[in-house]
Amino acid sequence: MAAPTRTPRGIWIAAGLRALAAGGPDAVRIEPLAQALGVTRGGFYWHFENRRAFLDELLDTWERRSTDEVLARVEREGGDPRDKVRRAGMLTFSRELLPIDLAVRDWSRRDRSVARRLRRVDNRRMAYLRTLIGALHPEADDVEARSLLAFSLAIGDHFIAAEHDGRSRAEVLELAMRRLLS
C-alpha cells in the first residue's frame, strides 16, 4: 500500500501568501486554504503546529524573499549604484511581492511582533539604500535624506491616486528617481 501523498509545505506557504496578500492575516484560515487546495486540513498539521506557526512561516518567507533574495540578486546582477537602487526597488515592490508587503504593513499596525519584523526588514532595506546612495554622495545628511525619500517614493507610490498632467506614473517615477540619484 502506497503512503498517502501530502501536500508539500511550499504549496501551503504559497496559498497562505496569496491569502495574506488578498485579505490580510484574517484571510489566512486553515479550512478555506485546504478547500482551495482540494485537500484536508490534516496535511496542514503535518507541516505546521498551528495557525500561529503558519503565520510566522509566512512572515519568514516574505522576509527572506523581499530582503535576502532581492539583495542577493541585485548584487549578483551588478551594475552601478543607481542601477542597483532601481533594481532593488523593482524587485522588492514587484507584482508578486508588493501585495504581501502592503498586507504586512497593514498587519503591523495591529500586531507588535509583526511591527518588529517589518522594522527589521525596513532597516535592512534602508541600510542597503544608504550604502548605494553613499557611493554617490559623501554627505551623511544627504545620504539619509535621499535614502528615506527613495524608500518613501517606492512605498508611497502605491497609495497615491493623483494624475500627472499628461505624463504616466512611470515617467514621473523615473524623473523623481533620476533627481534623487543625481
PLM regions and their residue ranges:
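Hydrophobic alpha-helical connector segments
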Residues: 57, 71-98, 150
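Short, basic, alpha-helical segments at the C-terminal edge of helix-turn-helix-like DNA-binding modules
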Residues: 60-66
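Helix-turn-helix
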Residues: 11, 15, 19-53, 57
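Helix-loop "lid/cap" segments that line or gate small-molecule binding pockets
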Residues: 87-95, 102-110, 132-135, 180
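Amphipathic alpha-helical packing segments from all-alpha helical-bundle domains
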Residues: 67, 98-102, 112-137, 145, ...
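N-terminal intrinsically disordered/low-complexity leader segments
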Residues: 1-7
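Hydrophobic/aromatic-rich alpha-helical bundle segments in the mid-to-C-terminal region
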Residues: 115-119, 135-182
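Solvent-exposed, amphipathic alpha-helical segments
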Residues: 11, 15-23, 69-73, 104, ...
